[in-house]
Curated annotation (Swiss-Prot):
Protein name, per record: DNA translocase FtsK
Function: Essential cell division protein that coordinates cell division and chromosome segregation. The N-terminus is involved in assembly of the cell-division machinery. The C-terminus functions as a DNA motor that moves dsDNA in an ATP-dependent manner towards the dif recombination site, which is located within the replication terminus region. Required for activation of the Xer recombinase, allowing activation of chromosome unlinking by recombination.
Annotated organism of origin: Caldanaerobacter subterraneus subsp. tengcongensis (strain DSM 15242 / JCM 11007 / NBRC 100824 / MB4) (Thermoanaerobacter tengcongensis)
One cellular component (GO) term of this entry: plasma membrane
Biological process according to GO: cell division; chromosome segregation
Molecular-function annotations in GO: ATP binding; ATP hydrolysis activity; DNA binding
Stretches of the chain found on the membrane's Cytoplasmic side: 158-709
Gene name in the database record: ftsK
Length: 709
């Protein structure tokens, strides 16, 4: 008797506890005032059930109330199971609608969990059902099965036959036809108004759904890294060299978020366009970058890659894009990359790169912050490993900004005792702003005639260092600095902003010095960065190109220019404004990078900080012998007369001719040609055209006789 009396009390206690739990669960979805437990319950429900978390919490609340206030079995078992099935169909359809394209299983579950927390999709439970359904029967088959089972569960819950419902609706429609014309018109008007209201409500719901942002966790991580890096700067204040404050550089602007629906629509357009040309392929992954979005495409068996590559223009037309670049295949993947420009380019600021953990932890003092790749990862290059860099790009493509980013990266990474720079700027206006910083070895060289002398000094410094290494029994600058820490040698970075201007003034000397430095200077700690806006073969000669394997190409005007700099096409498809192809030494294919941007105001702020806090100490570099070509008469070559005899006999003058006939090296033959030009015997350098003999034979003989006297 006592047990029977206590049974209702126990059930009531269980019911109250159940009601309290469901009430907390229900409120945790709408408010943050439920504490730590409520917060975790809400995250769990959203992560596992997505938008269905609101439905299941409401159902549990109703069940708790019915369990507490009714003494009978309030719902039959088959209806309970049907209700559960209907709920699973709801979250599965929701998941399938928002995320139909499958990725890696773990990535798909991870995205579903994060999206569920942000009230999108069907959470982990919905993603599990959808993943296996799509794998088995595809997207269309999944929709058919889910809708069919939804109808079955509705029938089980309501006990209403769908067939009888359709028949009764048809009978009512027949009866309605018998009504008078006046009533028909009124009914039609009423239906139209109702449809307008319904369509308006549907539009509002769609807009609300589209406004839901997909969470990007990278933003929070970047902010944390910035705080850490600012602390790192503060810790260095007591040392000999303090890099400029990071606050001198502009902060990054939050990137505009592209809706998943837009990306899925573009993926479908790509598949449809290829299908129209008889190519079956499927987009398996979409990667959004700062400037472009890459669609990874897997063609069906038997489809040639060249067929897809040939449809570049057709894909651009279908997607209404200014240009489309195809990477076939993507290195390390069995997929083809279709790179489509974003409607809005997200600028990558240099602060975002320098302020990153990757740049801060980079061990080399010659670290260069280039920008971000397609996946949004920060790209850092090591100039010490390149060991030289060739940069080319048309006007306005971002070449000068890249050079500024490179220089400022070195200023933040290395002290003047570690790295010194020689800046050669024939254009005068680009690099002059850096005069006075402590990292400069000599003031910015703006005279093209003096530039050859500076390069000659670099060659002599390289030879001196190799002699020093030989005397001390070491192989390179790293070994020397490690062994003799008190006599450390600084590394030298030579930056030439416009190579074509130097090649026009003294091509033979400049080519020879660059050739020698590119071949031998790496171990001596001397590195070249050469930039040009005219990547033609008379500027980037075969000798220079063969000895500088690392290259960066910005947007160029033609495929020929792209082949000249990269040995392949593709640079003509770039967007400009910092869009580059980075081809480091050892890479199988170039990496597409959105270059880091730094404004003139930021450069000026960094330079002013260094000028105010540090004094510049220039080394004396003697360049008199190379600044005036007329001094060549003072060191006339012994074989000059023999060279004159050769050109008079053959009727032509060239370096290669003197090399063959006189059996001398390139440098000596080039020097003799320069001396003949200064004496007015032969014409000057004119690109690919051969030099002409200007003076008649008699005048030449008089000059030589005068010299012998």
């Amino acid at each position: 008797m006592i047990d029977k009396k206590q049974k209702p009390v126990k059930e009531e206690i269980v019911g109250i506890i159940f009601l309290a739990f469901t009430l907390i669960s229900f409120l945790s979805l709408y408010t943050d005032s439920t504490g730590i437990i409520g917060k975790h319950i809400g995250i769990f429900l959203k992560g596992f059930f997505g938008t269905g978390s609101y439905v299941i919490s409401a159902l549990l609340l109703v069940f708790a109330l019915m369990f507490l206030f009714t003494n009978k079995n309030f719902i039959k078992l088959h209806r309970s199971m049907a209700l559960l099935g209907l709920f699973l169909m709801f979250i599965s359809l929701n998941q399938l609608y928002y995320f139909p394209v499958l990725t890696d299983f773990k990535d798909y579950l991870s995205v579903a969990y994060i999206s569920g927390i942000n009230n999108t999709g069907g959470g982990i439970i919905g993603s599990l059902i959808v993943y296996f359904l799509v794998k088995m029967v595809g997207i269309i088959g999944s929709y058919i099965l889910l809708i069919s089972f939804t109808a079955i569960f509705i029938v089980l819950i309501t006990d209403i036959s769908l067939v009888s419902l359709i028949k009764s609706s048809y009978d009512k429609l027949k009866d309605r036809k018998k009504v008078s014309a006046k009533n028909k018109l009124q009914d039609k008007m009423a239906e139209k108004k109702a449809e307008e209201v319904e369509s308006t409500e549907e539009l509002v719901e769609v807009e609300k759904k589209e406004r839901i942002d997909v969470p990007i966790e990278i933003v929070e991580q970047v902010e944390e890294e910035r705080k850490v890096y600012e602390k790192a700067f503060l810790e260095k204040e007591e040392g000999e060299y303090t890099p400029p404050p990071i606050t001198l550089l502009k902060e990054a602007i939050p990137s505009p978020k592209i809706k998943n629906e837009v990306l899925l629509e573009k993926a479908k357009k790509i598949e449809e366009t290829l299908r129209n040309f008889g190519i079956e392929a499927k987009v398996v992954q979409v990667t959004k970058g700062p400037a472009i979005t890459r669609f990874e495409l897997q063609p069906s068996a038997g489809v040639k890659v060249s067929r897809i590559v040939s449809l570049t223009d057709d894909l651009a037309l279908s997607l209404a894009a200014p240009s489309v670049r195809i990477e076939a295949p993507i290195p390390g993947k069995s997929a083809i990359g279709i790179e489509v420009p974003n409607e809005k380019i997200t600028p990558v600021y240099l602060r975002e790169v320098i302020d990153s953990k990757k740049f801060r932890s980079f061990k080399s003092e010659l670290a260069i912050g280039l920008g971000k790749d397609i996946a949004g990862n920060i790209v850092i290059a090591d100039l010490a490993k390149m060991p030289h860099l060739l940069i080319a790009g048309a006007t306005g493509s971002g070449k000068s900004v890249c050079i500024n980013s490179l220089i400022v990266s070195l200023l933040y990474k290395a002290s003047p005792k570690q790295v010194k720079m020689i800046l050669i700027d024939p254009k005068v206006v680009e690099l002059n702003i850096y005069n006075g910083i402590p990292h400069l070895l000599t003031p910015v060289v703006t005279d093209p005639k003096k530039a050859a002398g500076v390069l000659n000094w670099a060659v002599q410094e390289m030879i001196r260092r190799y002699s020093l290494f030989a005397d001390h029994g070491v192989r390179d600058i790293e070994s020397y600095n490690e062994k003799y820490k008190e006599e450390r040698l600084y590394k030298i970075v030579i930056i030439i902003d416009e190579l074509s201007d130097l090649m026009m003034v003294s091509p033979a000397e400049v080519e020879e010095y660059i050739f020698r430095l590119a071949q031998m200077a790496r171990a001596a700690g001397i590195h070249l960065v050469i930039a040009t806006q005219r990547p033609s073969v008379d500027v980037i000669t075969g000798v220079i190109k063969a000895n500088i394997p690392s290259r960066i190409s910005f947007a160029v005007s033609s495929q020929i220019d792209s082949r000249t700099i990269l040995d392949m096409t593709g640079a003509e498809k770039l967007l400009g404004k910092g869009d580059m192809l980075f081809d480091p030494i050892g890479a199988s294919k170039p990496i597409r990078v959105q270059g880091a941007f730094i404004s003139e105001e930021e450069v000026e702020a960094v330079v002013n900080f260094l000028k105010e806090n540090y004094s510049s100490h220039y080394e004396e570099i003697k360049v008199e012998e190379k600044t005036n070509g007329k001094n060549l008469d003072e060191e006339e070559d012994e074989l000059l007369e023999d060279a004159v005899s050769v050109i008079l006999e053959t009727g032509q003058a060239s370096i290669s001719l003197l090399q063959r006939k006189l059996r001398i090296g390139y440098a000596r033959a080039a020097r003799i040609i320069d001396q003949l030009e200064q004496k007015g015997i032969i014409s000057g350098y004119d690109g690919a055209k051969p030099r002409q003999i200007i003076l008649p034979r008699e005048e030449i003989q008089k000059i030589l006789e005068r010299k012998s006297v």
